C-alpha cells in the first residue's frame, strides 16, 4: 500500500524579516545533558550539565531553527566531554549557518578536601561553567567558578572586646583563558585569599582551627577581590577576568559585594 503523500510544510523561520534588526543571541536555554569532566587527580567525574546555546541571527531572517540545537547535543556521545566542547560549538555554527555562536555548560564539580587537623576527607562542590564563543571562526573559551569561602569582618574584630561577625561568601571568578587550566587551580587561588576556606566535614579540632584561622585573617569584601585579583594578574594562562565576591552578611539582611574586571591585553 502506498504511503499517503505529505504536502510541503512552510519553513516560517526562513521567511524574510523587514524590521532591519539583527538578534545578538537566539537559541535554547536550560537544557540538561550528561557530561564527563576530568579532574586534577586523574579521575573522571560523571555529572549533568545545564546548557545554553545561542547563535547570531541576521536582520533579514525571521527566526532560527530551535530543534537543531537539541539535535547537535544528541548527535554527540551520550556523555559530552570538555574536550568535545569546541567541536559542538563549531558544529552548531555550521549547522545553523551563523556568523557567531555561544554555548554555556554549567555543572557541579567536586573536590575531595582534607580537614586541617583531623585529616578526615569529604567532598566539596563548586559550580563551574564553561563558556565557548565563536565569532567569524575565532574560538574563545571562558571558565567561570563559584567558590564558597568564609569571610570575617576586620571592623567587627577591631571594635569588639571579643569575637567578630563572620559569614559564608561566594567568590566568582570568570576568566578568559589562552591555555588549559585546572578548575582546582582557580579554586586554590581563591581559597588561599579568603579568611578561611570551607569544608564538607569538620571534627571539633578542625572547627577550632577554622574559627581561629578566620579570626587571625580578617577580610573585607574589598580585600577578598583585591587579593584574588592580584593572583589572577600573575597567572599567564588568564587573558582577562572578572572577580566578584558576595558576602552573605550574618548581622544584616543584605549582602556586601565587590567586583574587579581586568583585560590584560589593554
UniProtKB/Swiss-Prot annotation:
Belongs to the GTP cyclohydrolase IV family. It comes from Methylobacillus flagellatus (strain ATCC 51484 / DSM 6875 / VKM B-1610 / KT). The keyword Hydrolase applies. Keywords: Hydrolase. PANTHER family: GTP CYCLOHYDROLASE MPTA. The gene is folE2. This is GTP cyclohydrolase FolE2. It is an enzyme of class 3 (hydrolase). The record marks 153 as: May be catalytically important. Its EC number is 3.5.4.16. Converts GTP to 7,8-dihydroneopterin triphosphate. Gene3D superfamilies: Urate Oxidase. It comes from the Bacteria. It catalyses: GTP + H2O = 7,8-dihydroneopterin 3'-triphosphate + formate + H(+). HAMAP family: GTP_cyclohydrol_B. Pathway: Cofactor biosynthesis; 7,8-dihydroneopterin triphosphate biosynthesis; 7,8-dihydroneopterin triphosphate from GTP: step 1/1. GO terms for molecular function: GTP cyclohydrolase I activity. GO terms for biological process: tetrahydrofolate biosynthetic process.
Amino acid at each position: 500500500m502506498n504511503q499517503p503523500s505529505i504536502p510541503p510544510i512552510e519553513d516560517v523561520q526562513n521567511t524574510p524579516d523587514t524590521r532591519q534588526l539583527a538578534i545578538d543571541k537566539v537559541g535554547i536555554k536550560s537544557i540538561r545533558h550528561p557530561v564527563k569532566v576530568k579532574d586534577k587527580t586523574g579521575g573522571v567525574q560523571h555529572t549533568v550539565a545545564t546548557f545554553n546555546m545561542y547563535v547570531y541571527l541576521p536582520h533579514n531572517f525571521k527566526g532560527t531553527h530551535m530543534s537543531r540545537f537539541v539535535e547537535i547535543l544528541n548527535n554527540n556521545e551520550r556523555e559530552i566531554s570538555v574536550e568535545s566542547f569546541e567541536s559542538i560549538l563549531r558544529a552548531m555554527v555550521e549547522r545553523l549557518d551563523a556568523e557567531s555562536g555561544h554555548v554555556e555548560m554549567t555543572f557541579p564539580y567536586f573536590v575531595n578536601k582534607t580537614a586541617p587537623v583531623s585529616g578526615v576527607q569529604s567532598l566539596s562542590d563548586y559550580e563551574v561553567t564553561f563558556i565557548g564563543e565563536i565569532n567569524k571562526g575565532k574560538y574563545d573559551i571562558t571558565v567561570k567558578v563559584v567558590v564558597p569561602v568564609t569571610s570575617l569582618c576586620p571592623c567587627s574584630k577591631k571594635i569588639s572586646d571579643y569575637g567578630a561577625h563572620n559569614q559564608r561568601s561566594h567568590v566568582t571568578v570568570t576568566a578568559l583563558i589562552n591555555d588549559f587550566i585546572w578548575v582546582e587551580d582557580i579554586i586554590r587561588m581563591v581559597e588561599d585569599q579568603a579568611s578561611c576556606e570551607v569544608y564538607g566535614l569538620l571534627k571539633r579540632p578542625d572547627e577550632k582551627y577554622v574559627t581561629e584561622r578566620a579570626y587571625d585573617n580578617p577580610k573585607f569584601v574589598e580585600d577578598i577581590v583585591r587579593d584574588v585579583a592580584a593572583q589572577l594578574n600573575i597567572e599567564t594562562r588568564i587573558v582577562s577576568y572578572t572577580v566578584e565576591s558576595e558576602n552573605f552578611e550574618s548581622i544584616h539582611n543584605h549582602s556586601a559585594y565587590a567586583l574587579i574586571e581586568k583585560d590584560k591585553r589593554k
